[in-house]
């Protein structure tokens, strides 16, 4: 009932960022429903409204959240809703630095509203933000939530640090010009699609037998169709072995080494957990939670669910 009352009320008052908008990702609804666990990426309380009542905490705590990504912001919002004093720290000046890039591929622009909505909702609840600030041992919170996320994975490949090797984020943020010459994308089907809008010589090298295996099937099918329409070359069972200034070498399923031209190589091998602060946090605080990709590199759905659960435990 409160949802039906608050939705039009907030819209009428122009508080659009305080409304949980569907971002058409299909990850929590269709994707999780196929596994028997219907939920929502944006709203982790979905289908659990009566199970999780967001009751006020018995004791008000000073809570430090390290990381202003989707998981950290959800932990902050949930903790603040329960009456805690919450401060979010992030060494970057941008909110959700890694997650921001997810909104750049075709058809995913609405994902950008997730961070802005969480930020606004946190501000309304009185959450304090200290952006561009690294945490200090001088701060003595009652509870710390480590939500430092993940960083791009860089495999030990010969030539991986060459000047012509760039990250998917560099491409998506427009920091690198990839409009000329053959481009090889190591992983990252959506990044290849993004590049193919202006460059028609794009090849994907994928180590697995198929690409886009982590994508919800209802998103994967149209994405595959667009990749074929753009005539992007896709090579699977390809293990990259060497990179130089004008080519990429890979081994196929038979162990044969093959070289293909590449003026630019996009490193989109995935991510690894980034968690340099857990031990320090535990040395200075008795109640510490590590959530999302700081535990294991994953997706926003997992990070947001983790953040919500952490907020409930405080």
PLM-predicted stretches and their roles:
Residues 1-66, 70, 75-81, 85-86, ...:
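Flavin-dependent oxidoreductase catalytic cores
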Residues 122, 141-142, 262-263:
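Local beta-strand N-terminus motif with an aromatic residue
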Residues 13-17, 104-108, 163, 220-223, ...:
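Short, hinge-like loop/turn segments at secondary-structure boundaries
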Residues 88-128, 191-238:
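Rossmann-like dinucleotide-binding cores of NAD(P)H-dependent redox enzymes
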Residues 244-248:
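Short, hydrophobic/aromatic-rich segments at coil-to-beta transitions
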Residues 60-91, 95, 130-138, 147-157, ...:
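Rossmann-like dinucleotide/flavin-binding elements
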Residues 1-13, 118-132:
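Repeat-solenoid scaffold signature
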